[in-house]
A protein has these predicted regions:
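Metal/cofactor-centered catalytic core regions of large enzymes
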Residues: 1-351
Length: 351
């Protein structure tokens, strides 16, 4: 509860556009993935279709965010069990991703890049090539990082058979993401309920067999490989066209050059800023496969620019709910390994 900020209540007093930066601060290790989930939820409520280029940008940045988040989770997990070197290598690779994020969005951490109906701006010239170059150099380094742990006797003693979560318990407690897949349940919304064009990309969903700390580590390691695989496919077939929905005029503020020269555009800009995008009455629930698990947004609209109710399904909150049961019968020192293998973010848990 120390990171509770009342996000859901704040949403009821802000326009749909104003709430985008607050989604950054849920799983703040993967803000681009949070942005995308929220934007798609509002777009479905508004019955707004975004073009293929926008979908590709969102998938690309979401998978980059997945790698970044898993690198931090892997490094922190290693540090929890005494493997300091893993954190140093992981932070070095994450820094390379942050430089790419900064070039695209203008910010390294809390990006607020995704917009309802599109993204803030198109990709810079040459940026896609630099993303491809990162993937080429990252995979060999990832293998070196994983070698430090995968067959490490001390690491295996700390994780194999420790913190076992059965398939039945994982489902009963609502676990999602790598923690659920580590227990042998191959649920991945990118495969099972694809969104933003994920259905056109080929990738595997890694699953564990025993549901222990070691399996959860292996799942996240393989997910990074699969994210690189998805990124390469996005780059290979990156579509042309607009990076925002052409019919998003009621949501998007017009370009500044038009605002300065057209009275109609100035009025439109004023209405968007002061009253927010006009969303029709209705309700929607959308969930996306984020690095920590399934992030869901339930939004109720009574019309106008401010949501009547917004509920956030936090994967970290659900994943942590099983801790009292998972801790039964294990050593106090093993609780550290269990917590590290769960890879939770309290900002998202407390909201």
């Amino acid at each position: 509860g120390y990171l509770h900020r009342g996000d859901e209540k704040i949403a009821e007093n802000m326009t749909y556009n104003q709430f985008v930066p607050y989604t950054d601060r849920l799983d703040y290790l993967a803000p681009l993935a949070n942005n995308m989930a929220y934007a798609i939820a509002v777009e479905r409520l508004a019955k707004l279709e975004v073009p293929a280029r926008c979908q590709a940008i969102r998938v690309l940045t979401a998978e980059m965010a997945r790698i970044s988040a898993h690198l931090m989770g892997l490094g922190a997990f290693g540090l929890d069990v005494g493997a300091w070197t893993v954190l140093l290598y992981s932070l070095e690779e994450r820094e390379k991703l942050y430089k790419l994020f900064e070039e695209l969005t203008g910010a390294r951490f809390t990006t607020s890049y995704t917009r309802i109906g599109g993204v803030t701006r198109d990709v810079p010239e040459g940026w896609l090539g630099r993303v491809g170059a990162f993937c080429d150099q990252f995979l060999p380094i990832l293998e070196e990082i994983l070698k430090l742990l995968t067959r490490n006797k001390i690491f295996m003693d700390r994780t194999v058979g420790v913190g076992v979560i059965s398939r039945a318990d994982a489902l009963a407690y609502g676990l999602t993401g790598p923690n659920l897949r580590g227990s042998g349940v191959g649920l991945d919304l990118r495969k099972d309920k694809p969104y933003s064009g994920y259905e056109q990309y080929e990738f595997d969903v890694p699953v564990g067999t025993t549901g222990d700390c070691y399996d959860r580590y292996l799942v996240r390691g393989e997910e990074m490989r699969q994210s690189v695989r998805i990124i390469r496919q996005v780059l290979a077939r990156f579509p042309d066209g607009p990076w925002y929905a052409p019919d998003a005029r009621r949501i998007f503020a017009p370009p500044k050059d038009k605002v300065m020269t057209s009275m109609e555009e100035l009025i439109q800009n004023f209405m968007i800023v002061t009253e927010g995008p006009q969303i029709p009455p209705g309700e929607v629930y959308f969930e996306a496969e984020n690095p920590k698990g399934v992030l869901g947004f339930f939004i109720v609209s009574r019309g106008g620019g401010v949501p009547y109710r917004l509920k956030i399904r936090s994967p970290s909150f659900c994943n942590l709910s099983i801790l009292p049961k998972a801790c039964q019968g294990i050593l106090i020192s093993d609780v550290v390994a269990l917590l590290g293998s769960m890879d939770f973010v309290m900002g998202e848990c407390d909201r």
